[in-house]
Design a protein with these regions (language model features):
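Basic, Lys/Arg- and aromatic-enriched nucleic-acid-binding interface segment
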Residues: 1-42, 50, 61-65, 85-86, ...
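Active-site/catalytic core of tyrosine-dependent DNA strand-transfer enzymes
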Residues: 1-8, 51, 70-119, 124, ...
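Conserved tyrosine-mediated DNA breakage-rejoining catalytic core shared by Y-recombinases
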Residues: 10, 37, 41-84, 150-157
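Short alpha-helical segment immediately N-terminal to, or the first helix within
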Residues: 28-29, 132-136, 146
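Residues in the recognition helix of alpha-helical DNA-binding motifs
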Residues: 42, 110, 146
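Short, polar N-cap/turn motifs at the start of nucleic acid-interacting alpha helices
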Residues: 46-53, 117-119, 138-158, 181-187
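Hydrophobic, well-ordered secondary-structure elements that form the walls
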Residues: 71, 130-133, 143, 159, ...
């Protein structure tokens, strides 16, 4: 997504007339740079509010390994808003039928309705996150770990098990502050 699309996303999100949990899910994806499917099937027991962490089990991850993600103050605020809507259930974003969780397609349709440009989907948040973080000098290992990418160097992957939580916590808070500024000022 371009800077203009980020600005437009927040303009459109303010006027979004769909289900409030859809809007909150899109915010969660933007703030954490997670994959849409990871947000769609998120469960309340994966979130640790005291330590501000989201622990996703390997079975739910593309790379099939556990993933821990720090939570920014803005993500905590999104989750607290969401608790009033879906906090009594298992899933953050339950399916409208009451069975299981929402589908990533619902999120894609919501973004399509925002007319952000051809091919703009919830997954597109990962590109501006990575680009912004790299351009602003954050450690590449922290960026890749946050994106839950698998290390391509097999030897390095075998030995390097660092989670870089402190660095990623700073990175995600700075990213969230950047997005909040974009939302508040209309510029990114």
């Amino acid at each position: 997504m371009t800077r203009e699309q980020i600005q437009r996303f927040y303009q459109e999100l303010r006027g979004y007339r769909g289900y409030p949990e859809t809007s909150l899910c899109l915010r969660l994806i933007a703030l954490t740079a997670c994959r849409p499917g990871e947000a769609a099937d998120a469960e309340w027991d994966e979130f640790d509010f005291e330590d501000a962490l989201w622990r996703r089990p390997a079975a739910k991850m593309k790379a099939r390994r556990d993933h821990v993600s720090p939570l920014s103050a803005q993500v905590i605020a999104v989750l607290k808003d969401l608790q009033h809507i879906t906090g009594d259930g298992r899933y953050l974003f339950p399916h409208r039928s009451g069975k299981g969780f929402t589908t990533p397609n619902r999120l894609t349709y919501a973004m399509r309705d925002m007319n952000l440009g051809r091919g703009t989907t919830p997954h597109c948040w990962r590109t501006p996150f990575s680009t912004w973080a790299n351009e602003n000098g954050y450690r590449p290992d922290a960026i890749e770990r946050q994106l839950a990418h698998v290390e391509s160097n097999k030897v390095r992957a075998t030995y390097n098990k660092a989670l870089l939580l402190d660095q990623r916590r700073t990175l995600l808070q700075d990213w969230a502050d950047y997005l909040s500024a974009a939302e508040g000022s209309g510029t990114a």
